[in-house]
Amino acid sequence: MAGRITKRGEALVVDTTGPDRLLVMKNYCHGVMSLVPVRHDPVTGGMDIEDLALKFTEKTAAVYFENPSYLGFLETQGQQIAEMAHARGGLCVVGVDPISLGVIAPPSHYGADIVCGDIQPLGVHMNFGGGQGGFISTRDEERFVMEYPSLLFGIAKTAVEGEWGFGDV
């Protein structure tokens, strides 16, 4: 999505990204976008900002990190990372565990453009071993919304006070 929006062909991905998620990213990006690893700071566990600055090119569509990370630490430099991406014409993409959003700031508060994650931690039933699903959210801007027009759902008030209806937009 970031590549289509920015018309660029690479994403910077912190090297602490979960291995399974990284495999999925490589699968989706194969032949379309290259993934460039960015080192993490061994003291804080966060993204190495100096390495990130060195890896940016005119081809960089997005910077991706997870919060909390696969290794369990919080990325405290989210706003700085997002500002760096935006200053260079890129997007900030954050992978989250939805359970964590009850206690840490949501990625939109520190500048994320695209947020994604796995819904399995929310207690999705295993249905014969296959109960997997994910979510994606973006800024409420046309350039993002137009990336998934057939998957857009909205909410609206109904005739009953306090009741909401849901449906395709």
Where are these regions (language model features)?
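Flexible loop/turn segments at secondary-structure boundaries
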Residues: P19-R21, T44-G45, Y70-L74, I99-I104, ...
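Short secondary-structure boundary/capping segments
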Residues: Y28, I81, Y110-G111, G130-F135
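Active-site C-terminal subdomain of aminotransferase-like
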Residues: L122-V169
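Generic beta-strand/beta-sheet core signal
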Residues: V14, V38-D41, V63-E66, L91-V96, ...
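Catalytic PLP-binding core of fold-type I/II PLP enzymes
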Residues: L74-I114
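Conserved beta-loop-alpha segment that forms the PLP phosphate-binding cup at the N-terminus of a helix
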Residues: M1-R8, G134
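Short, surface-exposed connector motifs at secondary-structure boundaries
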Residues: I5-E10, K59-A62, M84-G90
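PLP-dependent aminotransferase-class I/II
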Residues: V13-P68, G72-F73, Q80
